[in-house]
Amino acid sequence: MFAICDSGWVPVYLRWIYGIDRKQYCGPMIFKDLVAQGKHRMIFMGTNQKTLDSLQKELAKMNPDVMGMTFYELPFKTVDEFDYPAIAKMIEEDNADIVWVALGAPKQDFFMSLLKPHLKRGVMIGVGAAFNFYSGMGEKRAPEWVTRMHLEFIYRIMQSPKKQLKRCWGIVTSLPVMLYQEWRRKNKK
């Protein structure tokens, strides 16, 4: 098993609690690196067809092979309403090594966990807003100085307050308790 420090704060918490030094490697960074490598067959799922079409054109500048890959718009549904066996069959027939899922957190996480039992191969990676960032349609990632200061969440709240405030509130209200519990568990050893 491996874990990737997606949040800018995860490396900070690892350092505070365990003294472990890790760098952030978030979804958009992983996405760009793996697409540019050109070593894997990929399928891109989520968002809307307009964004997917623009994304395909932009990614082809990094990796021309992307033009022959599948970009699939997932219909707007709750996670319980998807036809997971049919989606898995499409992925299997595509022979994708990597399945990129952009439905936003936490929906994409639930989607992937429900799809996983139907897949025989490949790796699924939830990348949230990465499709929007790389589609060239206007949505940008926070400036580098903002991410270095671990304040990207504030930038994202300002970009789409209704969506992000709800998401961030859940994290802000549960994270201190989880961190304290982990700190206590670690110090009992």
Question: What would you call each of these model-derived segments?
Answer:
Residues 2, 41, 97-98, 123:
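Structural motif
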Residues 2-6, 46:
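A short beta-strand/loop micro-motif in the catalytic core of glycosyltransferases
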Residues 9, 103-108, 130-131:
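Short glycine-rich anion-binding loops that position phosphate/pyrophosphate groups of nucleotides
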Residues 11-90, 94:
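Conserved beta-alpha
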Residues 12, 141-189:
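A transmembrane-helix-recognition feature enriched in membrane-embedded lipid enzymes
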Residues 56, 109-118:
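Short Gly/Thr/Asp-enriched flexible loops that form oxyanion-binding sites at enzyme active sites
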Residues 74-79, 120-159:
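Short, flexible loop segments at boundaries between secondary-structure elements
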Residues 91, 95-100, 105, 121:
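Proline-aspartate-enriched helix->loop->beta-strand connector
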